[in-house]
Curated annotation (Swiss-Prot):
Region of interest (Disordered), residue spans: 1-23, 50-91, 140-161
Superkingdom classification of source: Eukaryota
Protein name: Putative uncharacterized protein PAK6-AS1
Taxonomic path: Eukaryota, Metazoa, Chordata, Craniata, Vertebrata
Ranges of biased composition (kind: Low complexity): 1-16
Length: 161
């Protein structure tokens, strides 16, 4: 007869033993993910004791965005600081930002990013040629989708904000 805690010879867990997965404690990260875990987690056969405490909404109705949700004439904290883009900006509207008119550049060198295509997107090139194509100097010009100049004119310390 096999000893308790050992799997029988033909494989599978021994009868009457728990798998080691059930015995392992939950990692510490679990507690960080669930803030007041012990208070409201459902236990077997017991009703929930308490609910997680949600912070009450400070301003605006339910479901309404709180940041940058004012009408275009009003100044709110996020909009007034100039650091954030307005959420209420319509599709045709051009924002004035650090680079001039238009949005901040997505690819600073001004070319279409070839890296963004997954390998199956270019089946016609073998991998070696693909890398050679990426190594060619990309044409310089205005940033993608923007009317601003690249590199930006003015203070060279523009990166430090």
């Amino acid at each position: 007869m096999p000893r308790a805690g050992r799997a029988p010879a033909e494989g599978g867990p021994a009868p009457g033993t728990r798998s080691s997965r059930c015995l392992r404690p939950r990692p510490l990260a679990w507690r960080r993910l669930v803030p007041n875990f012990g208070a409201w987690a459902p236990r077997k056969g017991a009703a929930r004791v308490g609910r997680p405490v949600l912070s009450p909404r400070t301003s605006g109705a339910a479901g309404e965005p709180t940041c940058g949700a004012g009408s275009p004439g009003t100044l709110e904290e996020g909009v007034a600081s100039g650091r954030t883009r307005r959420r209420t900006q319509s599709a045709g509207e051009v924002a004035k930002c650090r680079w001039g008119l238009g949005q901040e550049p997505l690819c600073p060198r001004g070319a279409v990013l070839l890296n963004s295509f997954s390998p199956p997107a270019w089946p016609q090139f073998p991998p070696a040629l693909r890398l050679r194509a990426l190594a060619w100097p990309q044409p310089r010009g205005p940033a993608c989708g923007s009317t601003a100049q690249w590199p930006p004119r003015g203070d060279p310390t523009w990166r430090i904000s």
